[in-house]
Amino acid sequence: ATNLQLTLARHPPALHGLGPLSNYLRRQSMVTVVDQLLMGLRVAWLCQSEAMWAELAFEARAVGLGDREIRQVAGGPDAGWGDWDGTVLRAADEIYRDSFLSDDSWQRMATRYDAQQLLDVIFSGAEFIMLSMMANSFGVQPDDRFPDRFPVDVEYQPLMARSASARLSEARLEPIEREDWSTEVRELLDPAGTGGAVLNLYATLARHPTFFRPRAVQSAYIRTGATLSDRDREILILRIGWLCGSEYEWSQHVRVARRIGMSADEILDVAVGATASRWSRFEADLLRATDELHHQDTVSDATWSALSNRYDTGQLIDMVITVAGYRMVSIALNSLGTQLEPGRPRFPDVARQ
């Protein structure tokens, strides 16, 4: 077990909730191992997670990458890579910075990867962001058995500010229409045979049934198995959806927030952030933690200490998992171009900071 896994073992339900998707993406993904490791190393560098860098560098050496290539990852996609490897690293940069895979990267990757592999690419990059956020926030140290550390002769250069470009007006991957469902897809989307409406997100991810199942386990854990209150969870999810520019995620969770009793003004103030006057000190700290996780890929000591006055270890772990998990979902929704169902709530007219 890695140090991150041993840390998560302090809260076993979380380990079980995250395990199936992590295992799929790391061990069964349809993306080549080298492409995964290039993305993972690049994301670990961008997130400044030395624990993840050390682990992935160890794996990279096992598949033939050497000192030069591993160091070169820190230099980014323009550090002398060939066309394909540069595309993979650029995709990692975009997913991290913009929560979105650009048209150019999508088109380039589609020359080699099919729809299921593209799903795996997007979620693999987002998974490495999630793991790095957790390792940073929990203070996980590099394992002694992984000797690599960050290259000391490469200066860390933060990427330019995240793009505010408009999201896709058409889906890159369309939801599967009911008349085209296979038996396997029907068992995933409508196992009881009720004929009810299926969200566009689910009908899109069902294009990859092998991936759909472990992802559903993680989603169910965050939504129903974690230790956070409904209100705390929805504040976190709405805020990270807003920060990532995922209108679909925002829209779906506005509906959830309404069902659990949050008012329209409270939902609006999630977009305003921690400075809105209506929040309790604790709720402002939740929003602040989300902002820190999005912008710095970790929770500051001050915010962690403040949250620790109310949250126990399991809740602190679940707080980070919730934000990181829905950052992953936002990246996927944006990159797939998943469109809102008719009549659903849109983003509020609130200036972005």
Could you describe each region identified by the protein language model?
Residues A1-Q353:
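Hydrophobic alpha-helical segments
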